[in-house]
């Protein structure tokens, strides 16, 4: 796994003097309580089973051989996955009970199916359980039929709202257990999926939501689709559970099938229904984003893998720069956990991208820690090993050397709000949605427009929505009806709101410590009032992100001003991100009560206005000044009239 979590002799990856990697035999797959499925490990090496195979028996992990007595223990989730018969048991039994909830093992497994069990934390008495469903939409693409289906499901089986997420998907809250199969099957039968939207596997693959008819944008979105297909589970557990085994999958591109099946460098589990994942899947969640030069709408460096299209002087895509090791989650006051930006690993030709991505995923699969989930993301493996060692190991699975990264221009955050020409005679319209929550008159009007004009939509990584393929003659009536529902053009939306994000937090998220989505409207109004008080112009802005806990779902550690839940009605304040999302923030103050935000922020905004350099953003200013000086400015601040 990692440098502190070793496989047994004969199965471990071994570094020789010249740093080559020897992928040895997987020995001794034995367990007193489980059965190994099949007769082969990685690369087709025979492995003796401890008992005869049985499709109904718990399954020994192909990728995790039985450990000797001295081996590091595995987390309980690893044991649950091992015994689940490829993410089926005991979820399949729990769904049939009369109880409104499922047991602990099933809670972990249903994540792989795209759902979290929740309850309303503000209700007293017994817990009223429900389930949140999350769709999987590579590049944020939502066909017209799927949007209308999700809109219907929210009203009939949810809480009457849809939520657009920071990974370009829908979240549907409030689904009762008894309705799960109906809702899931409806999504599947209407061009959607929730498979892998949660759980220890590749999540939704991001790409710019703009439907430009440009070679690099189209290629980025095609690549995102192909990576999503490559890393999608193959064992059928999802369709078995929700549509009785009926397959609703489109034909995969041949290059995806070829890359998945290729085992030239010992990446696959031979004869396993999960050739890439095995029975243990990945140690933790895994996130991928694809984009084009300059377009950082996807928060590229926060992903486990970031992929950037590189084109020649004629605009023809030639290959990709790849970044590895980003991730946001951390734990308060536990310095061994941290947010981290991805770093360059190299360049690959366009025909090799699926093989390179697969090699990176397999490196994490084989070496990521499985004993302590706090340290199981790939960022900790790379931080432990260093990028050079990580690259060496990946290259053994890739079968080639990475080329030097190509030089790229500066990044920009692109929101795609407002009207834009697609390049094919049609238009697209980006609409700001506060915290991604679509409800009320906004929801009703969006449905009417999308249904009337048969529009496909896309979800952005900033929780907004894009209406696609709009004819010129439709622009005026669509603009008018949207404005009447509060879906305004960007010139009428506060610049602070346009870049702000928040996670759902209370009342349904089990990890929330304090408010986020429900708290951010007031926070943004107070920041605007502070701007006015210190003399900052209306068109000036600061990237503000709010989360209810330190797990970082709204990527607060990239914000210029990040507020991270740190107790009831209090936040940890983070400063130092940049508007183009290329610099990570740092923790500035702990446990700042929400009613004390003016005491902290107003002096900083005031001195930023007075002391900033030309075009210096708030995040750049706070980094240049340093935290010691900033705290001094807060302590000595006597108001605007000083």
From Swiss-Prot:
UniProt-listed Enzyme Commission number(s): 1.8.7.1
Gene3D superfamilies recorded: Sulfite Reductase Hemoprotein, domain 1 (3.30.413.10)
Transit peptide: 1-61
Binding-site list for [4Fe-4S] cluster: 503, 509, 549, 553
Binding site for siroheme: 553
Gene Ontology annotations for the cellular component aspect, listed alphabetically: apoplast; chloroplast; chloroplast envelope; chloroplast nucleoid; chloroplast stroma; plasma membrane; plastid; stromule
Taxonomic superkingdom: Eukaryota
Keyword annotations: 4Fe-4S, Chloroplast, DNA-binding, Heme, Iron, Iron-sulfur, Metal-binding, Oxidoreductase, Plastid, Thioether bond, Transit peptide
Annotated tissue distribution: Present in leaves and roots.
Family the UniProt entry places it in: Belongs to the nitrite and sulfite reductase 4Fe-4S domain family.
Oligomeric form and interacting partners: Monomer. Interacts with ferredoxin.
Record's protein name: Assimilatory sulfite reductase (ferredoxin), chloroplastic
